[in-house]
Every structure is written in structure tokens, then in C-alpha cells.
């Protein structure tokens, strides 16, 4: 079992690197068992909140931690015998069985999820934005769609009764353009595409409904020519919406002439509007060109002004100076002399103030250079010490690696041994199946022979019974046959009892071997020590209670 224990230790070290490796599982302490099992359960079921260490204080806490881990193993599907004793008094056989089960239950994609988590931490802002957009769209697609007529549903109450109030009032002045684009001019089409409100915008208010407005518009188009004028006036009593295309009133002279057809009148109006629109567009272009030219001239003028202003200011100052030249020259000479003397004074003051500062600066530079040199020397010494320590550690690790490579079998050796174990198991399974087949064949043969013997016995018994009525020798032979049959039955019973006893003996031997492997003596010693700790704790509590009672009695 040494190879199995090494494989288990290797898997546990991958799960939790803080687990101290041991040569065998029998050397595991209760603290190591708790850490290993809790680490495996944390990988299998991350939702479980289990303690990772075994407290070293009161025994009640240790029992609680062990019981919670045992319950977690049972919830994970472990069907073996497990309890707090498995963790507080570990047994190599039971512990090996438990750890093998937990290692088999470890998720295979654990490494993949770690890589995925590291990749998710390096996502760009664009990828995060795309992920957020996908999440928002998926959430919006899951929300139910509410029709337009049900979005303004209110709950009305009247005289103790409640009902849903849904408004279906139409928009009387609904403007629906024609479906044929050839009937519209270019300007009308541009207006409809860019500025005209659509059906949803015209019925967006809560007082009108889209379906009712469309139906009302269809009825008006259908029956508008048939209804009387009074009805149409009543229908259009509300405030009319502005039409999409303004109408043009005909001149007064045209009214006196013969009234043209409606189509001709509309075409004339459209033609007139088109001419007006073209004229307005031409005027607009001309005005735009003029405005651009004026803006360009304005820009040039501003640039010229900004360029001339410095020269103008200089000329103004020069003219002021030349107005009284002698007096201004005397003032300038006096100002120049005072400025020179002031400059000399400031230069002398600056030199007097600068000299000690330069000396202190040189001293500080020298001190800083010396400090830097000393720091470099200290860092060099520290690096040399670290280099020696790293070299020594490197040599120790090399020695450890050589010893480990010599003492531990390589991975290929483990794989080869595992394949050998699997081959032996398959061979044993084949042998077991062969023994079972032989047992079945033998059982069939025994059943056949038993049936033949039973038939022979019945036939012989019938013949001898018929002959015993007339022959004394046949009567004696019949008695001997009955005695032989009874003796044979006793022999069969003895053989069956012997087989059962042998089977029970083998089961007891296996159970004895299992109990020997459990180290019952060591477990009993640990339990005895824990009981003594409990007794000491109980005595301490009793003494504390007596002290409190005496204090209360004295007071």
C-alpha cells in the first residue's frame, strides 16, 4: 500500500500545499486528516462552510468539527462507516478508503476553471462592455411584452367595485401618408422622411390609442364623401392638427371662373408649391453664399486689426514721447541711471545672498554623494550575503532533489505499477468469473445426479416393496435400502454443515485481520486520554461552581 499512499499524498498536496507529506497514511495526525478532508470537500462542494483546522482546546469543539466533516462526507455520497472517530482516532484502512473516494470525486475541470478565472481578470474594456450588453439584452428578452393599449391600464374604483380602465379613444387628426411614393414630390418625400411624425409619435399620448386611431382614419376615408357636412363638422370638433402640407388659397379672380376639377386644382397647388419651394431654395442658397462671403471678410478684418494693434500702440507711445522731447529725454536718462544703480545694488545683494547658498549646496552635494556611496556599499554587501544564502539554498535543494529522485519512484514507475495493479485486478476478476462458472456447472451436474439418484431410489424402492411381499430376502434388502438412504441424507447434511462452518471461519478470519489493521489498542489509548481530559474539565467546572457558591454564601 506504499505506492497507493504516495499517490494519495501527491493528490492531497495538489489540493492543499500546506499539508505536510508523510510516508504512510498511518502516520497522519487528526489535524492533518481534518485539513485534507476539508480541502477535498471545499473543492467538491464550494457551497459548504466547513472548518479547515481542528481546534486544540475543548474536546466538545473537536467533536463538533469532526461530526460536521463526517456529515459533509455523507452528503457528498460516501456510503462507508464514518463518524467523529474517523477523524479523532484515524485508522489507516478507513482513512485510505475515505481519501480515495474524495480524490475520485474531485472535479476534473478545476485547473480549467483557474485558467478561465485568470483569463477573465485580463479582459479588455471592450470585452467587458460586450458581455454587459449581452447580459442586458438577454434580461430584456426574458421580460414579457406588453401591448400598447395595455401600458396605460389603470384600476378604477366606484361604489365599492373595481375595474380595469382602458382608453380606446382615437386621434381624429391622424395623418397617414400615401403608400405610393410616386404621388408625392421630392420635397414632400423629404419632409415625410425627416420631419413628419410617424403613427406611433402621433398616438404616443395616453389619451389616444393607435388601433382606434387607424380604424377611425379608415372609416373617415371610406365614408367622408357620403356623410353630411354637419356630421363631419361634429367629428372634427376637436382641435385639428396642422396638416403635413400647407394649402394655398386660390386668387379671387379664379373663384369667378368655372370651378375646375379637384385633381386639377390639387395638381395646380402642388405645382405652385413646388415653384415656391424652388424659389425659396434658390434664395436660401444666394443668402448662404452672401453670408459666407461676409463671414470671410469679417475674419480677414479681425486678423488685420489684431496685426495692426501692436504697431498702433507703439506709435501712440512714440508720439507721446516726442511731444516734449527734451524733458522726456532727461526723464529717461534719470530713469536709466536709477535703474542701473538699482541693478548694481541688486546684483551685489544677490551675490552676497548666493555665496553661502552655493557653499551649503556644495556641502549637501558632497554629503549626498557620500551617503549614496555608503548605501551602494551596504546594498553590495547585502546582495553578497543574499547571493551566498541563495547559493547555499540552491545546493541544499539540489541535494534534496537528488535524494528525492533516488528515493521516490518517477511518475512512469507509478504509472507502470498502476497498470500492473489494474492487470492483476482484471486477472483476479477473470479467475473469479471462471470459478463462478465452474461452480454453476458443478451445481448443474449435482442437480442432475441428484435427480437421477432420486428417480433410481424411487424405482428401486417400488420394486423391492413389491417383491418384499412375497420374498424374505427382498424384505431384508428393502430394509437395508431404507437404512442406506437415511445414512446418505445424514452424510449430505454433514457436508453442508461443514461448508457453512468453513465459510464462517473464513469470514471471522477476514474480520480478525481487519480488526488487527485498525490498531484498536492505540485507539483505545487515545479514547482513554480524551476521557481523562473530560474528567479533568468536569472537575474544574465543579470547583468553579463550589467557589461561586461559597462566595454567594459568604456574601
Swiss-Prot record:
Highest taxon in the source lineage: Eukaryota
GO BP annotations listed: positive regulation of ubiquitin-dependent protein catabolic process
UniProt KW Signal keyword: no
UniProt key word Coiled coil: yes
Gene Ontology molecular function: cullin family protein binding
Alphabetized Pfam families for the sequence: CCDC22_CC, CCDC22_N
Coiled coil feature spans: 263-406, 500-555
Key words, A-Z: Coiled coil
InterPro entries: CCDC22 (IPR008530), CCDC22_CC (IPR048348), CCDC22_N (IPR048349)
Family named by the database record: Belongs to the CCDC22 family.
Protein name, UniProt field: Coiled-coil domain-containing protein 22 homolog
Species of origin: Drosophila melanogaster (Fruit fly)
Amino acid at each position: 500500500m506504499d505506492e497507493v499512499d504516495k499517490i494519495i499524498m501527491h493528490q492531497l498536496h495538489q489540493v492543499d500545499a500546506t499539508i505536510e507529506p508523510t510516508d504512510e497514511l498511518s502516520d497522519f495526525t487528526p489535524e492533518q486528516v481534518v485539513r485534507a478532508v476539508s480541502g477535498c470537500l471545499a473543492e467538491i462542494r464550494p457551497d459548504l462552510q466547513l472548518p479547515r483546522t481542528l481546534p486544540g482546546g475543548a474536546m466538545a469543539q473537536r467533536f463538533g468539527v469532526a461530526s460536521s466533516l463526517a456529515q459533509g462526507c455523507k452528503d457528498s455520497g460516501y456510503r462507508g462507516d464514518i463518524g467523529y472517530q474517523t477523524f479523532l482516532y484515524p485508522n489507516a484502512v478507513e482513512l485510505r478508503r475515505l481519501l480515495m473516494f474524495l480524490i475520485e470525486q474531485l472535479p476534473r475541470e478545476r485547473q480549467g476553471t483557474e485558467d478561465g478565472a485568470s483569463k477573465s481578470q485580463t479582459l479588455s474594456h471592450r470585452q467587458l462592455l460586450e458581455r454587459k450588453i449581452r447580459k442586458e439584452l438577454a434580461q430584456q428578452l426574458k421580460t414579457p411584452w406588453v401591448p400598447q393599449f395595455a401600458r396605460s391600464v389603470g384600476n378604477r374604483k366606484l361604489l365599492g367595485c373595481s375595474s380595469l380602465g382602458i382608453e380606446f379613444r382615437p386621434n381624429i387628426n391622424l395623418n397617414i401618408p400615401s403608400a405610393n411614393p410616386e404621388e408625392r414630390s421630392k420635397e414632400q418625400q423629404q419632409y415625410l422622411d425627416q420631419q413628419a411624425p410617424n403613427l406611433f409619435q402621433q398616438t404616443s399620448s395616453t389619451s389616444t390609442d393607435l388601433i382606434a386611431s387607424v380604424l377611425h382614419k379608415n372609416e373617415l376615408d371610406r365614408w367622408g364623401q357620403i356623410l353630411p357636412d354637419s356630421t363631419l363638422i361634429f367629428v372634427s370638433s376637436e382641435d385639428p392638427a396642422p396638416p403635413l402640407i400647407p394649402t394655398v388659397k386660390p386668387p379671387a379672380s379664379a373663384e369667378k371662373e368655372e370651378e375646375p376639377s379637384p385633381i386639377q386644382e390639387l395638381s395646380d397647388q402642388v405645382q405652385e408649391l413646388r415653384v415656391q419651394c424652388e424659389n425659396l431654395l434658390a434664395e436660401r442658397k444666394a443668402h448662404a453664399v452672401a453670408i459666407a462671403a461676409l463671414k470671410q471678410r469679417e475674419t480677414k478684418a479681425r486678423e488685420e486689426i489684431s496685426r495692426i494693434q501692436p504697431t498702433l500702440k507703439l506709435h501712440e507711445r512714440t508720439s507721446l514721447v516726442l511731444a516734449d522731447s527734451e524733458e522726456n529725454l532727461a526723464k529717461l536718462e534719470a530713469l536709466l541711471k536709477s535703474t542701473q544703480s538699482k541693478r548694481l545694488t541688486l546684483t551685489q545683494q544677490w551675490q552676497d545672498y548666493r555665496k553661502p547658498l552655493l557653499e551649503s549646496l556644495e556641502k549637501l552635494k558632497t554629503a549626498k554623494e557620500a551617503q549614496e556611496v555608503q548605501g551602494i556599499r551596504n546594498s553590495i554587501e547585502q546582495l553578497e550575503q543574499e547571493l551566498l544564502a541563495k547559493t547555499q539554498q540552491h545546493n541544499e535543494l539540489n541535494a534534496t532533489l537528488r535524494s528525492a529522485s533516488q528515493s521516490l519512484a518517477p511518475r512512469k514507475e507509478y504509472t507502470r505499477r498502476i497498470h500492473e495493479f489494474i492487470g492483476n485486478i482484471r486477472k483476479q476478476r477473470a479467475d473469479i468469473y471462471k470459478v463462478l462458472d465452474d461452480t454453476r456447472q458443478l451445481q448443474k451436474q449435482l442437480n442432475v445426479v441428484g435427480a437421477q439418484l432420486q428417480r433410481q431410489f424411487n424405482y428401486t424402492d417400488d420394486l423391492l416393496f413389491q417383491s418384499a411381499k412375497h420374498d424374505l430376502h427382498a424384505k431384508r434388502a428393502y430394509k437395508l435400502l431404507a437404512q442406506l438412504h437415511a445414512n446418505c441424507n445424514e452424510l449430505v447434511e454433514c457436508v453442508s454443515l461443514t461448508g457453512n462452518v468453513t465459510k464462517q471461519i473464513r469470514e471471522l478470519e477476514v474480520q480478525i485481520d481487519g480488526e488487527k489493521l485498525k490498531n484498536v489498542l492505540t485507539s483505545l489509548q487515545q479514547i482513554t486520554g480524551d476521557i481523562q481530559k473530560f474528567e479533568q474539565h468536569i472537575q474544574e467546572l465543579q470547583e468553579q461552581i463550589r467557589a461561586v457558591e461559597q462566595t454567594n454564601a459568604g456574601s
